Protein backbone atom coordinates (compact mmCIF):
# COMPACT_ATOMS: atom_id res chain seq x y z
CA UNK A 1 0.00 0.00 0.00
CA UNK A 2 1.28 3.49 -0.85
CA UNK A 3 2.31 5.88 1.86
CA UNK A 4 -0.49 8.16 3.05
CA UNK A 5 -0.78 11.67 1.62
CA UNK A 6 -2.38 14.08 4.09
CA UNK A 7 -3.97 17.24 2.70
CA UNK A 8 -4.88 20.14 4.97
CA UNK A 9 -7.76 22.36 3.82
CA UNK A 10 -6.88 25.14 6.20
CA UNK A 11 -9.65 27.73 5.84
CA UNK A 12 -12.18 27.21 3.03
CA UNK A 13 -14.53 29.94 1.88
CA UNK A 14 -17.55 29.46 4.13
CA UNK A 15 -16.37 28.64 7.67
CA UNK A 16 -15.82 31.65 9.95
CA UNK A 17 -14.31 32.60 13.29
CA UNK A 18 -17.81 32.29 14.72
CA UNK A 19 -17.53 28.56 14.05
CA UNK A 20 -14.01 28.42 15.50
CA UNK A 21 -11.94 31.49 16.48
CA UNK A 22 -8.82 29.82 15.07
CA UNK A 23 -10.10 29.91 11.47
CA UNK A 24 -7.53 32.02 9.55
CA UNK A 25 -8.36 35.13 7.54
CA UNK A 26 -5.22 37.28 7.25
CA UNK A 27 -2.09 36.28 5.34
CA UNK A 28 -0.25 35.85 8.64
CA UNK A 29 -3.00 33.63 10.05
CA UNK A 30 -3.18 31.53 6.88
CA UNK A 31 0.59 30.98 6.95
CA UNK A 32 0.42 30.07 10.65
CA UNK A 33 -2.22 27.42 9.94
CA UNK A 34 -0.42 26.09 6.88
CA UNK A 35 2.77 25.68 8.90
CA UNK A 36 0.96 23.99 11.77
CA UNK A 37 -0.46 21.43 9.33
CA UNK A 38 2.83 21.00 7.45
CA UNK A 39 4.82 20.49 10.65
CA UNK A 40 2.26 17.91 11.80
CA UNK A 41 2.62 15.83 8.62
CA UNK A 42 0.52 17.36 5.84
CA UNK A 43 2.27 17.37 2.48
CA UNK A 44 -0.51 19.19 0.57
CA UNK A 45 -2.04 22.53 1.54
CA UNK A 46 -5.45 23.02 -0.08
CA UNK A 47 -5.78 26.78 -0.23
CA UNK A 48 -8.62 29.25 -0.23
CA UNK A 49 -7.79 32.84 0.66
CA UNK A 50 -9.69 35.59 2.44
CA UNK A 51 -9.61 39.32 2.85
CA UNK A 52 -8.60 40.45 6.33
CA UNK A 53 -12.27 40.67 7.35
CA UNK A 54 -12.88 37.05 6.32
CA UNK A 55 -14.54 37.74 2.95
CA UNK A 56 -13.61 34.97 0.49
CA UNK A 57 -11.67 36.15 -2.56
CA UNK A 58 -10.04 34.62 -5.62
CA UNK A 59 -7.77 37.62 -6.16
CA UNK A 60 -4.58 36.48 -7.88
CA UNK A 61 -2.65 39.06 -5.89
CA UNK A 62 -4.01 37.78 -2.57
CA UNK A 63 -3.24 34.20 -3.58
CA UNK A 64 0.31 35.19 -4.52
CA UNK A 65 0.87 36.84 -1.16
CA UNK A 66 -0.31 33.72 0.65
CA UNK A 67 1.47 31.24 -1.63
CA UNK A 68 4.79 33.08 -1.41
CA UNK A 69 4.57 33.30 2.37
CA UNK A 70 3.59 29.63 2.73
CA UNK A 71 6.49 28.57 0.50
CA UNK A 72 8.86 30.48 2.75
CA UNK A 73 7.45 28.86 5.90
CA UNK A 74 6.88 25.39 4.37
CA UNK A 75 9.43 25.20 1.54
CA UNK A 76 8.60 21.68 0.33
CA UNK A 77 4.80 21.76 0.68
CA UNK A 78 2.55 21.13 -2.32
CA UNK A 79 0.24 24.13 -2.48
CA UNK A 80 -3.10 23.36 -4.09
CA UNK A 81 -5.25 26.47 -4.69
CA UNK A 82 -9.00 26.09 -4.99
CA UNK A 83 -10.73 27.02 -8.23
CA UNK A 84 -14.06 26.48 -6.48
CA UNK A 85 -13.87 29.86 -4.78
CA UNK A 86 -17.22 30.66 -3.22
CA UNK A 87 -20.77 30.22 -4.49
CA UNK A 88 -21.67 33.02 -6.90
CA UNK A 89 -18.18 33.84 -8.15
CA UNK A 90 -17.61 34.14 -11.91
CA UNK A 91 -15.53 31.67 -13.91
CA UNK A 92 -12.89 34.36 -14.43
CA UNK A 93 -12.65 35.00 -10.70
CA UNK A 94 -12.38 31.32 -9.87
CA UNK A 95 -9.59 30.71 -12.40
CA UNK A 96 -7.23 33.41 -11.10
CA UNK A 97 -4.92 31.23 -8.97
CA UNK A 98 -4.26 28.90 -11.93
CA UNK A 99 -2.32 31.71 -13.59
CA UNK A 100 0.22 31.54 -10.74
CA UNK A 101 1.16 28.09 -12.13
CA UNK A 102 0.83 26.11 -8.88
CA UNK A 103 1.76 22.43 -8.84
CA UNK A 104 -1.89 21.43 -8.27
CA UNK A 105 -5.35 22.98 -8.21
CA UNK A 106 -8.84 21.69 -7.57
CA UNK A 107 -11.11 20.94 -10.55
CA UNK A 108 -14.78 20.61 -9.63
CA UNK A 109 -16.40 18.02 -11.88
CA UNK A 110 -20.10 18.79 -11.56
CA UNK A 111 -22.85 20.96 -10.15
CA UNK A 112 -24.15 20.48 -6.62
CA UNK A 113 -27.13 21.81 -4.65
CA UNK A 114 -25.64 23.08 -1.40
CA UNK A 115 -28.99 23.80 0.22
CA UNK A 116 -31.61 26.54 0.11
CA UNK A 117 -30.98 28.60 -3.01
CA UNK A 118 -27.21 27.89 -3.14
CA UNK A 119 -26.15 26.07 -6.28
CA UNK A 120 -22.45 25.37 -6.89
CA UNK A 121 -22.41 25.56 -10.67
CA UNK A 122 -19.87 23.61 -12.75
CA UNK A 123 -21.18 22.96 -16.26
CA UNK A 124 -19.42 20.62 -18.68
CA UNK A 125 -18.08 23.56 -20.67
CA UNK A 126 -16.79 25.19 -17.49
CA UNK A 127 -14.95 22.02 -16.51
CA UNK A 128 -13.40 21.74 -19.98
CA UNK A 129 -12.35 25.41 -19.87
CA UNK A 130 -10.85 25.19 -16.38
CA UNK A 131 -8.95 22.03 -17.34
CA UNK A 132 -7.65 23.69 -20.51
CA UNK A 133 -6.05 26.45 -18.46
CA UNK A 134 -4.62 23.93 -16.01
CA UNK A 135 -3.00 21.98 -18.84
CA UNK A 136 -1.69 25.21 -20.38
CA UNK A 137 -0.13 26.29 -17.08
CA UNK A 138 1.28 22.90 -16.09
CA UNK A 139 -1.12 22.40 -13.18
CA UNK A 140 -2.08 18.91 -11.94
CA UNK A 141 -5.86 18.84 -11.37
CA UNK A 142 -7.45 17.22 -8.37
CA UNK A 143 -10.87 16.12 -9.60
CA UNK A 144 -13.38 17.12 -6.91
CA UNK A 145 -16.41 14.84 -6.95
CA UNK A 146 -19.50 15.20 -4.77
CA UNK A 147 -21.26 12.13 -6.16
CA UNK A 148 -20.72 9.26 -8.60
CA UNK A 149 -22.02 11.16 -11.63
CA UNK A 150 -19.07 13.55 -11.33
CA UNK A 151 -16.67 10.61 -11.61
CA UNK A 152 -18.46 9.65 -14.82
CA UNK A 153 -18.07 13.22 -16.09
CA UNK A 154 -14.33 13.22 -15.36
CA UNK A 155 -13.82 9.85 -17.06
CA UNK A 156 -15.80 10.98 -20.11
CA UNK A 157 -13.79 14.20 -20.42
CA UNK A 158 -10.51 12.35 -19.90
CA UNK A 159 -11.35 9.99 -22.76
CA UNK A 160 -11.83 13.06 -24.96
CA UNK A 161 -8.45 14.45 -23.88
CA UNK A 162 -9.83 17.30 -21.81
CA UNK A 163 -8.44 16.02 -18.48
CA UNK A 164 -4.97 14.55 -18.19
CA UNK A 165 -4.50 11.03 -16.86
CA UNK A 166 -3.89 9.30 -14.54
CA UNK A 167 -6.44 11.28 -12.56
CA UNK A 168 -6.39 12.02 -8.86
CA UNK A 169 -9.84 12.29 -7.28
CA UNK A 170 -11.03 13.93 -4.10
CA UNK A 171 -14.22 12.32 -2.79
CA UNK A 172 -16.11 15.10 -1.00
CA UNK A 173 -18.53 13.26 1.27
CA UNK A 174 -21.29 14.40 3.57
CA UNK A 175 -21.98 17.74 1.87
CA UNK A 176 -25.63 18.78 1.59
CA UNK A 177 -26.68 17.75 -1.92
CA UNK A 178 -23.81 15.30 -2.35
CA UNK A 179 -23.11 11.67 -1.51
CA UNK A 180 -23.38 10.55 2.11
CA UNK A 181 -20.28 9.85 4.20
CA UNK A 182 -20.68 6.12 4.81
CA UNK A 183 -18.36 3.13 4.30
CA UNK A 184 -20.78 1.70 1.73
CA UNK A 185 -20.70 4.89 -0.32
CA UNK A 186 -16.91 5.13 -0.15
CA UNK A 187 -16.52 1.57 -1.43
CA UNK A 188 -18.95 2.46 -4.25
CA UNK A 189 -16.89 5.52 -5.24
CA UNK A 190 -13.60 3.61 -5.09
CA UNK A 191 -15.03 0.97 -7.42
CA UNK A 192 -16.13 3.66 -9.88
CA UNK A 193 -12.74 5.25 -10.65
CA UNK A 194 -10.15 3.95 -13.14
CA UNK A 195 -7.73 1.43 -11.64
CA UNK A 196 -4.73 3.67 -12.27
CA UNK A 197 -6.31 6.62 -10.44
CA UNK A 198 -5.59 7.66 -6.86
CA UNK A 199 -8.04 9.21 -4.43
CA UNK A 200 -8.35 11.34 -1.32
CA UNK A 201 -11.32 11.37 1.05
CA UNK A 202 -12.73 14.63 2.42
CA UNK A 203 -15.60 14.08 4.84
CA UNK A 204 -17.53 16.85 6.51
CA UNK A 205 -17.97 17.57 10.20
CA UNK A 206 -18.45 14.58 12.50
CA UNK A 207 -17.74 12.25 9.56
CA UNK A 208 -14.19 13.49 9.08
CA UNK A 209 -12.26 11.03 11.22
CA UNK A 210 -14.37 7.88 10.70
CA UNK A 211 -14.01 8.33 6.94
CA UNK A 212 -10.33 9.19 7.32
CA UNK A 213 -9.88 5.78 8.93
CA UNK A 214 -11.75 4.18 6.02
CA UNK A 215 -9.51 5.98 3.52
CA UNK A 216 -6.38 4.82 5.32
CA UNK A 217 -7.37 1.14 5.32
CA UNK A 218 -8.63 1.14 1.71
CA UNK A 219 -5.43 2.61 0.26
CA UNK A 220 -6.70 6.14 -0.25
CA UNK A 221 -5.43 9.43 1.08
CA UNK A 222 -6.93 11.85 3.58
CA UNK A 223 -7.94 15.51 3.70
CA UNK A 224 -8.71 17.23 6.98
CA UNK A 225 -8.85 20.87 8.03
CA UNK A 226 -11.05 23.74 9.10
CA UNK A 227 -12.69 23.94 5.66
CA UNK A 228 -14.38 20.61 6.35
CA UNK A 229 -14.50 20.34 10.15
CA UNK A 230 -13.60 22.67 13.03
CA UNK A 231 -13.75 20.12 15.90
CA UNK A 232 -11.06 17.78 17.19
CA UNK A 233 -13.75 15.75 18.97
CA UNK A 234 -17.42 16.21 19.73
CA UNK A 235 -17.99 19.69 21.15
CA UNK A 236 -14.28 20.55 21.35
CA UNK A 237 -13.03 23.13 18.80
CA UNK A 238 -9.66 22.27 17.28
CA UNK A 239 -6.83 24.57 18.32
CA UNK A 240 -5.29 24.45 14.87
CA UNK A 241 -5.25 22.61 11.56
CA UNK A 242 -2.12 20.95 12.85
CA UNK A 243 -4.10 19.32 15.65
CA UNK A 244 -6.45 17.78 13.06
CA UNK A 245 -3.49 16.51 11.02
CA UNK A 246 -1.87 15.04 14.13
CA UNK A 247 -4.99 12.96 14.75
CA UNK A 248 -4.78 11.50 11.23
CA UNK A 249 -1.09 10.74 11.74
CA UNK A 250 -1.99 8.82 14.91
CA UNK A 251 -4.67 6.87 13.03
CA UNK A 252 -2.22 6.02 10.25
CA UNK A 253 0.33 4.81 12.79
CA UNK A 254 -2.26 2.57 14.45
CA UNK A 255 -3.06 1.00 11.07
CA UNK A 256 0.62 0.64 10.19
CA UNK A 257 0.56 3.02 7.25
CA UNK A 258 3.49 5.45 6.94
CA UNK A 259 2.78 9.10 6.12
CA UNK A 260 4.21 10.46 2.86
CA UNK A 261 6.66 13.33 2.78
CA UNK A 262 6.01 16.07 0.21
CA UNK A 263 8.58 14.54 -2.16
CA UNK A 264 6.95 11.11 -1.79
CA UNK A 265 3.53 12.70 -2.35
CA UNK A 266 4.79 14.23 -5.60
CA UNK A 267 5.94 10.82 -6.78
CA UNK A 268 2.58 9.23 -5.94
CA UNK A 269 0.65 12.05 -7.65
CA UNK A 270 2.94 12.23 -10.68
CA UNK A 271 4.03 15.80 -10.03
CA UNK A 272 7.44 17.12 -11.06
CA UNK A 273 8.64 19.93 -8.80
Swiss-Prot record:
The lineage of its organism: Bacteria, Bacillati, Bacillota, Clostridia, Peptostreptococcales. GO terms for biological process: L-lysine catabolic process to acetate. This is 3-keto-5-aminohexanoate cleavage enzyme. It comes from the Bacteria. The keyword Metal-binding applies. Its cofactor is Zn(2+). Homotetramer. The gene is kce. GO terms for molecular function: 3-keto-5-aminohexanoate cleavage activity; metal ion binding. Transmembrane segments: none annotated. The keyword Zinc applies. Pfam families: BKACE. It catalyses: (5S)-5-amino-3-oxohexanoate + acetyl-CoA = (3S)-3-aminobutanoyl-CoA + acetoacetate. Pathway: Amino-acid degradation; L-lysine degradation via acetate pathway. Disulfide bonds: none annotated. Involved in the anaerobic fermentation of lysine. Catalyzes the reversible reaction between 3-keto-5-aminohexanoate (KAH) and acetyl-CoA to form 3-aminobutyryl-CoA and acetoacetate. The reaction involves the deprotonation of KAH, the nucleophilic addition onto acetyl-CoA and the intramolecular transfer of the CoA moiety. Belongs to the BKACE family. Kce subfamily. Signal peptide: none annotated. Keywords: Metal-binding, Transferase, Zinc. Zn(2+) binds at residues 46, 48, 227. It comes from Acetoanaerobium sticklandii (strain ATCC 12662 / DSM 519 / JCM 1433 / CCUG 9281 / NCIMB 10654 / HF). (5S)-5-amino-3-oxohexanoate binds at residues 14, 82, 85, 106. Its EC number is 2.3.1.247.
Amino acid sequence: MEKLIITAAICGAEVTKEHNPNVPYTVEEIVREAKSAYDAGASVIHLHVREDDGTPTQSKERFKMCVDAIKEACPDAIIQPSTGGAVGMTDEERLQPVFLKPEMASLDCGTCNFGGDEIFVNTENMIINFSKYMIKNGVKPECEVFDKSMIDMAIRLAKKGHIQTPMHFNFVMGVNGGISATPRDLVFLIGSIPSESSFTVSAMGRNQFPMAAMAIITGGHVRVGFEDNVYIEKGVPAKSNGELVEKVVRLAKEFGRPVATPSEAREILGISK
